């Protein structure tokens, strides 16, 4: 996850001496604003949502496992509930860079000791030097030693490793391999002080991209490995190997405890060593790539060094000399229980998927986790269960040979449990995957891969809203788009899609019509020239559709606002200035009187009023964004952070938080006259984000929530009296580094939501507090997930695990209608987890099935299972086949968007102009209709749509959409397919009820043969059944 903090960063004065800073990580809070205890929890997404570059198993204690992230800190595995515990939430605003973890070492002699090398960037983005954090209680508390150079937890090569290691014979000794040409460093007092190993000859030469500031630094040392057999307990290990990011001489060895070093003779050259692992039999395995990762890598090899003879052997599953090698090698794991058993991962095989390779004979022969079985078909050695985070499909339905979800990408680290040959974990750009039956691979049985990231929440949050109805929270996120959070403690079933882009940069809802929402990001126009960077929702963020138009030539992004009644949009693009639309995004016109890249918001009462902020100036529009005028407001920050927000329910009331630490105004300002003037609050020294929530009992004004510094203390604060007084609502154990956004909840007094840059979304409530009228939630039992899928295809069937949160109750039964499932045959239990048998699931009918979990007390919980069948269906008679699914499957929607795949099953070319596809539906209120072709293989301009009423209404249909092609669409060769994605709506955008439509495919999420649409060639029915 490469996330640049686009804000001026605080620079604390850091000593460059090597002596340790002997202070606890959680100092006592100084006298400041009064505090109120809050309970803090992550909003659950279930997968993490960011890059996990390192997973580290302790070699001497089972189940002691750590994970490090690039911007979200470090975690420790909790075997009791198979989740991860965050260890660095104490990191605050000023020392935010400590959440970038470039290396982690767990002590193999004293398992209570653990060390982190922290620092986020080695360039100008990070003013702070790096540090070594050390703990004697497994990361519960930390002490810090500041280093005289920077550390790059979010820099290129961050999944190399580990750069920080503990001597397995004398655990007082640690080594750290630095970046930026700073070489090798050594500590002999448990990491308290450090000195440079001046005899080490090569600090590294490789630079990823000299022309780019982010990639222009020397990557440096990549990993360090001890040969434990060369030492004895209590004395320094004598033989040490170091991998360096250098394409000439990259592997160095010391045989005298680090006093002298030489390059290992005969070593391969030309590539960069990603990992080096020494097996118990004396074999040193090394993965190489022509890039340092995590995104690059187009060639690579795997080598083995016989450390006894000095012989090097190229053991690559697919060597770099092969035309089939289009990737490097990254992740490397050696089975401590079985010498000679190892695995490697591609870095990166983006298409059709990553590849894991496994060898049982030291790399002489390999098997791979998937292989082609008659292109485009693939044969899989695995099943994949994403029920813990169903959104990991990323909303895609790719055509073979691709599948969704994927095994992953950016697999720079892969580990086999040293105590359990069946357990393997690996990190990806989005989550941690793993298996508990790895050795099935060796018996030609499938391994079961599932998400193993419970507790990891690593997303970078760009925007949050809490509407007065619908879901309590909707998020805009970096890299994973965003979610509607219907249950804060359960993973969302899907991410935003249609439009689907990596990051939602800005999000808004209509205050007086909260189900109407808008979001913007940056679409991939290269992949889809018809893409749009703006999405709209009419159901509170459950479903989205792209606008029909956008400002000409824009790359998207920026900020967006919607009027209080939902009738008008104002979009400040990242590149083409500010534009407005009064046609629901069907057309856009440039606004006047406001500079490009201004931040825009809407008044929460007056539907014609919008505001903008740029370079210390406030702009207001009273005509729906058509024109803006600069107000007389003065004294606001010219640069730095800027958060302008309008108060719900009060026209013209604004708050502004912003400024920076480098000088100039910084703090919190208030306006009650639509931005004509602002008053600065004297009791707030610094502020970076402001939000609003339900008023306190007995109060009329909204509760205020701020990310701020008050009375010399940084934290999160609440004011119930319009900013006259503040209480701190976090403590020093819950700081979460840099917080990007804050908001309250308009329905729950005291509730606050935080968006962070790498620790996901947090929410909190007062401990034992009064929520101001909303009934506190009753503690019931629950299940996770609440929705999942099962494929009747025999090759893809797998048991479904369901985690129970019992809360003191017991499971009484599981029911499917009147049928009570039988434990032992229909399902099994292990602790608080249920495993639904694939044998039972295979008896279910296609469609949505509901299993009701009944407990000894409290409410039932329902698991919704979408049963599908991707088994090849015998084709009906005819020269064409039509597959279809609906892009929007909600019961009601203001647009219907079927997606078709048309295949020529005949033996001769087919003129597309002769083909007609019909979709049958009910009009649900006669109105004129609009037709849109969102995308088509043959070109959207070559697709036509015609509406007509049926001669007589039939069951499920009174109207039909006929889709045709122009002569310019050309021909479709025998055996080939073409795709058409269309959408239609009423001109007034009133809703259709889809559930009773003949052609509606309620449960399909990917292309399936669908007989309820019909296809004609030259007027003759060739596919489907007419209603």
UniProtKB/Swiss-Prot annotation:
Single GO MF annotation: cellulose binding
Entry keyword set: Carbohydrate metabolism, Cellulose degradation, Glycosidase, Hydrolase, Polysaccharide degradation, Repeat, Signal
Biological process per Gene Ontology, one example term: xyloglucan metabolic process
pH-activity profile: Optimum pH is 6.0-6.5. Stable between pH 5.0 and 7.5.
Domain CBM3: from-to ranges: 876-1027
EC annotation from Swiss-Prot or TrEMBL: 3.2.1.-
Coiled coil: none
Keyword Membrane carried by entry: no
InterPro entries found in the cross-reference section: Carbo-bd_X2 (IPR005102), CBM2/CBM3_carb-bd_dom_sf (IPR008965), CBM3 (IPR001956), CBM3_sf (IPR036966), Ig-like_fold (IPR013783), Ig_E-set (IPR014756), WD40/YVTN_repeat-like_dom_sf (IPR015943), Xyloglucanase_GH74 (IPR052025)
Temperature-activity note from the record: Optimum temperature is 60-70 degrees Celsius. Stable up to 55 degrees Celsius.
Catalytic residues identified in the record: 70 (nucleophile), 479 (proton donor)
Repeat as UniProt keyword: yes
Signal peptide residue numbers: 1-32
SUPFAM superfamilies: Carbohydrate-binding domain, E set domains, Oligoxyloglucan reducing end-specific cellobiohydrolase
PANTHER family hit by this protein: OLIGOXYLOGLUCAN-REDUCING END-SPECIFIC XYLOGLUCANASE-RELATED, XYLOGLUCANASE (EUROFUNG)
Function: Hydrolyzes the glucosidic bonds of unbranched Glc residues in tamarind seed xyloglucan, producing XXXG, XLXG, XXLG and XLLG. May have a dual endo- and exo- mode of action towards xyloglucan, or may have an endo-processive mode of action.
Family under the similarity heading: Belongs to the glycosyl hydrolase 74 family.
Protein name per its UniProtKB record: Xyloglucanase
Organism of derivation: Paenibacillus sp
